[in-house]
């Protein structure tokens, strides 16, 4: 009989076998900081217009080529619990503002890196946290003073276009003027009088071929589908939408039939035909000339639809059906009954068109007062179009933010350097040990212009010293000139490089909260993972014998 081996005394004694336990500065805090630094370093090189792309292949073997931090993090599936906190902060930024996710990561990474220096010098964690929280509060007090201008008229396409340049530029440098104009046209055309803008009302349809500059905006909806029948174009369309198949009702009983004569064979399907004819005629008599269905279309129903000159469109996606109902003002009917006038939708024209070599059905409103607008994107590869779609998404979200708060702050690192300068001065006036943390908080802001400079290929230290010198003279709006080949600065307000006030406000708040949360952790206790061994993923033939 084997002897009972006692567990080592201490915390591990209380836990189940296989559980892991880390505590103290070395094991918990520094480890967490290291993980967050690594994550921030990964996305830092993707920051700004000259940021590098990342090639990510997810667990479904889908390829992503992008410099959008939100997409990179979503597909990376980060496992480390501390790094996950930073990822969650960037997801919150994505939900709140729709842009600035990389700012949160880079800034939180810089805060933790500088906190590690202070902890190694002998400051306690609570002093660092207190200093960071005071500095964050001070940054939010200073930020309103840095506002350089406000959006005046959100119904002017040219003004809106100029305000969207910066957010689009970070994803599609070189195409920002063209894309910002498209996004502005789409947003302004459906901006309601109430001022409540819904980002879901801007749809994107990606069609392979041609180039980015062949993209266009359309008031209405575009579907990559073909029409089912012979009718391919209808003006002044009255639309009936059905969520059921466009077919006759079939009973669930067995259909065994005994036919004794040729006449009976002739009359066999006549009743079914007459019923289908009556159903389609009843729909046509209501004035409906376009039928959209969410199910299959029977051959017989198609024949009668052609007979009564009804255009038939089949949409497999229930989401597409819902959006179409919203666009044309229709109600989706669950059964093949003739619609009443209130249930029918209206559209100026519905037609089949060919874009490149792709057939599309277009539901078009001539007036710019539709509920939904569609941006038709063209591009040479699917990955490129996906990246352009992300740029469009950022632009639309920026417009949404401007409808909530019209204030703008200078971009290109100008706001960050001014905050760093003023918070450093404030830190000098604080008597306690938290002054060191406040100064480090200010220093963390330098990570943003430093990342922009490094990604543009110029010397970061030279740029930052130039920016400090200019800001010391009182030029608050001067930031990094990313187009210059040598370290240079210029006025961001004149250059039109502007960031939203809300975007900056939330990014600073969320990054600080995430960094403080990571620093507050002094113990990590991990239970043994449940279940047996997981099968190896990726190998399709993992259970077959290997012939080496």
Swiss-Prot record:
User: What start-end ranges are recorded for coiled-coil regions in this protein?
Assistant: none
Catalyses: ATP + H2O = ADP + phosphate + H(+)
> One GO CC term of this entry?
chaperonin-containing T-complex
Q: Residues of crosslink Glycyl lysine isopeptide (Lys-Gly) (interchain with G-Cter in SUMO2)?
A: 224, 254, 260, 534, 539
Keyword match Secreted: no
Instruction: Give GO terms: molecular function aspect only.
Output: ATP binding; ATP hydrolysis activity; ATP-dependent protein folding chaperone; unfolded protein binding
This one is known as T-complex protein 1 subunit theta
User: Which organism's genome codes for this protein?
Assistant: Bos taurus (Bovine)
């Amino acid at each position: 009989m084997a002897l009972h081996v006692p567990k080592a005394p201490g915390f591990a004694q209380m836990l189940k076998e296989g559980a892991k336990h880390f505590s103290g500065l070395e094991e918990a805090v520094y480890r967490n900081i290291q993980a967050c630094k690594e994550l921030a370093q990964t996305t830092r090189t993707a920051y700004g217009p000259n940021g590098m792309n990342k090639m990510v292949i997810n667990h479904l073997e889908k390829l992503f080529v992008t410099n959008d931090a939100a997409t990179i993090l979503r597909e990376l599936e980060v496992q480390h619990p501390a790094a996950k906190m930073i990822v969650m902060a960037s997801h919150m930024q994505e939900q709140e503002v729709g842009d600035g996710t990389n700012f949160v990561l880079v800034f939180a990474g810089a805060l933790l890196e500088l906190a590690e220096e202070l902890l190694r010098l002998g400051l306690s964690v609570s002093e660092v946290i207190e200093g960071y929280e005071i500095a964050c509060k001070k940054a939010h007090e200073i930020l309103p003073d840095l506002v350089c201008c406000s959006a005046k008229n959100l119904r002017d396409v040219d003004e809106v276009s100029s305000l969207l340049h910066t957010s689009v530029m970070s994803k599609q440098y070189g195409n920002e003027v063209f894309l910002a104009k498209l996004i502005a046209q789409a947003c302004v055309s459906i901006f309601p009088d109430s001022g409540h803008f819904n980002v879901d009302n801007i749809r994107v349809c990606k069609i392979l071929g041609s180039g980015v500059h062949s993209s266009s905006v359309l008031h209405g909806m575009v579907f990559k589908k073909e029409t089912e029948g012979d009718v391919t174009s209808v003006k002044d369309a009255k639309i009936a939408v059905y969520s059921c198949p466009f077919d006759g009702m079939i009973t669930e009983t067995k259909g065994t039939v005994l036919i004794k004569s040729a006449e009976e064979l002739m009359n066999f399907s006549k009743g079914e035909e007459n019923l289908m004819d009556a159903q389609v005629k009843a729909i046509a008599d209501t004035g409906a000339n376009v039928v959209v269905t969410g199910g299959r279309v029977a051959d017989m129903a198609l024949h009668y639809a052609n007979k009564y000159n009804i255009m038939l469109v089949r949409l497999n996606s229930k989401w597409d059906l819902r959006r179409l109902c919203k666009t044309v003002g229709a109600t989706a009917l669950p059964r093949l009954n003739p619609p009443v006038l209130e249930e029918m939708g209206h559209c100026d024209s519905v037609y089949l068109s060919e874009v490149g070599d792709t057939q599309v059905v277009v539901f078009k409103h001539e007036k710019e007062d539709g509920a939904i607008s569609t941006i038709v994107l063209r591009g040479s590869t699917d990955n490129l179009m996906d990246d352009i779609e992300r740029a469009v998404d950022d632009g639309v979200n920026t417009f949404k933010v401007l409808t909530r708060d019209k204030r703008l702050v200078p971009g290109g690192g100008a706001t960050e350097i001014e905050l760093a300068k003023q918070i450093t001065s404030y830190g000098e006036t604080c008597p306690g040990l938290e002054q060191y943390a406040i100064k480090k908080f200010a220093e963390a802001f330098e990570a943003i212009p430093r990342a922009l400079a490094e990604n543009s290929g110029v010397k970061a230290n030279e740029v930052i010293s130039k920016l400090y010198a200019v800001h010391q003279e009182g030029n608050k709006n001067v930031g990094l000139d990313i187009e210059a080949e040598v370290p240079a600065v210029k006025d961001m307000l004149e250059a039109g490089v502007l960031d939203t006030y809300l975007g900056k406000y939330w990014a600073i708040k969320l990054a600080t909260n995430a960094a403080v949360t990571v620093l507050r952790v002094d113990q990590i206790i991990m239970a043994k993972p449940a279940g047996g061994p997981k099968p190896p993923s990726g190998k399709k033939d993992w259970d077959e014998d290997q012939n080496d």
